Amino acid sequence: MDTLTNSQDYSNVDLSLESLAEELYNIQSFNKDVILDSFDIDDYDHTQLDTTIDFNKFKIGLTILKISSKGKPQKKKLIFDLARNQIVCGKKKKVNFSEIDEIRVGHKTNIFNQFKSSKNLKEDIESIQQSFSILFSGNLRKTMDFVCSDIPERRQIVSALYHVVQESKSVNNEYNFVKREWDRVGKDSIDFSTLKKILARLNFTTSDAVLHNLMKFSDSNSDYHLDFSEFSNLLKLLRSHPEMKPVFYKYNGGNGEWVPIQGMIDFFRIEQSEVWTVEQCRDLIKKYHHERLDCISFENFEEFICGEANLAQYPHTSTVYQDTSKPLSYYFINSSHNTYLSGHQLKGLSTSEMYTNTLRQGCKCVELDVWDGNDGDPIIFHGNTLTSQIKFSHVCETIKARGFETSPYPVILSLEVHCSVPQQIMMANHMKEIFGEMLPTPLPEGTKELPTLDSLKYKILLKGHTSHTHVSAVGNSSASSSQSNIQTDDNDDDGAVDLTEYDEVDDRSASSSSSSFSLSFGSSGKKKKITKIKIAPEFEELIYLVSHGFKSGNTTKEIPSYKIHSLVEEKVKQLVQSEPREVVEASQNHLLRVYPRGTRFDSSNFDPMPGWSIGCQLAALNQQTSSEPMWINDGMFSDNGGCGYVLKPPCLLPGECETYDPTSPERIKSSKYSRLIVNVISARQLPKYTKSTKGEVIDPYVTLSIVGTHFDQKVEKTKVIDNNGFNPHWGEEFEFPLYNSQLSMLLIRVDDKDKVGHNRIGHHCIRVENIRPGYRILKLKNNFNRTIPLANLLCKFTFVE
């Protein structure tokens, strides 16, 4: 006998065909508002729609100059396809309105910056004011760049596009999803075979008999076809959560299909560990415009469970709620390595757009690898490689414009300077001119404590070498050298492709000249001659955080607080075992930065947790690379409003750090929880992995990992659900012991198990102590840390203190 997929019961689901299809899908859009950047070009308000705009001309299309990737203006027809919710440029270029992240007025993209001095592209004021760009596709930051015939035309196009995109993002996401699938059919109604194809495309398959029953159930006029409303109802049926019915009926007090207010109060208290008042319950019922205000239906209850108000992470963590009056060293700081690279370390594209992306994601420490430019103006690129080059001044302008969009807290520039003295002076002039009062006065010599986070709002802190920087000698080891010869980054040249290892040397081995420091640019494991580069006083006087070689935690405690250590990832692993307490104590007043080993040519990442576990504030990751280390980093810095600074837990701060040992099997006394129990219930609308075979339906499974200190490491997996990515159901429970819940993270990833291996679908990472107990929704994220529309996981979380 045929049954519904995963034995789910779809009986008693309200499928009233009288309601409008729009009302069936009322979860808020997961998309962020489009960013409009026009403030420095003109004072025209594009957000106020010009009532004289004729949208018909945009539907028909208008001729415009599009700048190609080679900087050549080409005449193209620009069309707003409102039926398909996309913008069309020429015959091939199509972008969904909902995928557009930003509209920029002027010459503000890599295309414009790269070609604005060419013969094809004018750089006069009028040309700039006639130009605009569309940025889309998430972190890939693809662009379409245009020049209009005049300023009024540009204003009309940008204003119209802004409103169309905003409307597309604000219209209910689920309704958009159903409408999009329906529009792809191009018919007024669909038959059984078409329905089967659509559902397969949506990752749902079942037997023909079950699908016939589903279609019959939704076919209100029994004509063996489904119109849009009937199709909407069928998808609503498949998206429902019948597995929540036993929980619902547990609190109905004998009221059949309704749970009274007292039952709601009991549900929130017992299942969700929340205290709700009668008035709050009534407000919740009112939200769904129900005719009764004394009880809630299962449909509305289910809608709440799967909605924005029931996400797994505590709502207050989406704001800056932590104490920001502590010294800078008390915070974990969201940090980037080789920020300018969009890909491979040896041949990738260097782009200022990566700084925009990284800063908008909440990153507060970015890296600039600066070299002499052929025209006398410093450039940024990955030295001695085939990576492309960008102007240092352009990056500074980007940092000033974007550095404080997510929060007012300071931005740290990690400067890897390989320039001659004249171009160092040029660097200093650029920074003084562009940053101005954002550059704070360097700290006095005897500083024992760094300034508070609050006192450094809107400041740009320069990290780099001074004439007193410790000089390193080059060892004769190769890239695979022993642990005793680990690079400690005395000269902090982690930005260059350098497989040479460094040993610390005594100050006496430094050059007698106090105005030089040493850099090695070797790309092999052989001994290289040290190159000495003089430091310009004009540059040196701007340095706020002075790079300094690390010897030991105890030694660090004796030097001024403005001196910062950079440690290669292997060194950190060594310190976790050899002197964890000393490093934790040193991190009370000093910043410690961890960076990837030089052999990570593919821009892969290291696990940031070992560094965090001993107090290292900055884990400099290749943020252009999506992998578990970056997901863990995103989970950490989704806390405290995503401002880029997260207060270190008590075990790493004065009062507890003196007795803290991350390698001890003893449970931390201040750990809030001793156990976490996770029931993985079900998922909805899991997308196909991009490399999946065309037409196949995914077979999803869930992996749960606790990531923390040495003893907080455990991985569990659910069973595989065959041929169902639309509404898979697991109902599996897992238990995780916790030794230090302050630092522990829960990483959940969903994968497709197929014949060729594991295919990633989505993930979600969250700090354990930020998880709300009870039945909660986790939104799944893609490789770019963007929420996947409509894809979510329903879990129940239980904590034992």
Curated annotation (Swiss-Prot):
Which positions bind substrate?
K463, S566, R593
SMART domains for the chain: C2 (SM00239), PLCXc (SM00148), PLCYc (SM00149)
> Which residues are annotated with the PTM Phosphoserine?
S524
Keyword terms, alphabetized: Calcium, Hydrolase, Lipid degradation, Lipid metabolism, Metal-binding, Phosphoprotein, Transducer
Residue numbers spanned by region Disordered: 471-523
Enzyme class, first EC level, given as a word: hydrolase
Ranges annotated as biased composition (Low complexity):
471-485, 510-523
Q: Where is the C2 domain?
A: 656-781
> Is Transferase given among the entry's keywords?
no
- Record-level GO BP terms: establishment of protein localization; inositol trisphosphate biosynthetic process; lipid catabolic process; negative regulation of asexual reproduction; negative regulation of chemotaxis; phagocytosis; phosphatidylinositol-mediated signaling; release of sequestered calcium ion into cytosol
Catalysed reactions, as listed in the record: a 1,2-diacyl-sn-glycero-3-phospho-(1D-myo-inositol-4,5-bisphosphate) + H2O = 1D-myo-inositol 1,4,5-trisphosphate + a 1,2-diacyl-sn-glycerol + H(+)
What Enzyme Commission number does this protein have? 3.1.4.11
Q: Name one GO molecular function term.
A: calcium ion binding
Q: Which residues form the EF-hand domain?
A: 206-241
Q: Could you say which residues bind Ca(2+) here?
A: D490, D492, D494, E501
Compositional bias, Acidic residues, is annotated for: 489-506
Kindly identify the residues recorded as the active site: H337, H382
Question: What domain of life is recorded for the organism?
Answer: Eukaryota
The PI-PLC X-box domain covers which part of the protein? Answer: 322-464
* Cysteine pairs bridged by disulfides in the record: none
* Claim: RNA-binding is one of the keywords in the record: no
- Where would I find the PI-PLC Y-box domain in this sequence? 542-652
Q: Which residues carry this modification: Phosphothreonine?
A: T531
Q: Which PANTHER family match?
A: 1-PHOSPHATIDYLINOSITOL 4,5-BISPHOSPHATE PHOSPHODIESTERASE BETA-4 (PTHR10336:SF36), PHOSPHOINOSITIDE-SPECIFIC PHOSPHOLIPASE C FAMILY PROTEIN (PTHR10336)
Q: What does this protein do?
A: The production of the second messenger molecules diacylglycerol (DAG) and inositol 1,4,5-trisphosphate (IP3) is mediated by activated phosphatidylinositol-specific phospholipase C enzymes.
Query: What's the name of the protein?
Result: 1-phosphatidylinositol 4,5-bisphosphate phosphodiesterase
- Its encoding gene is what? plc
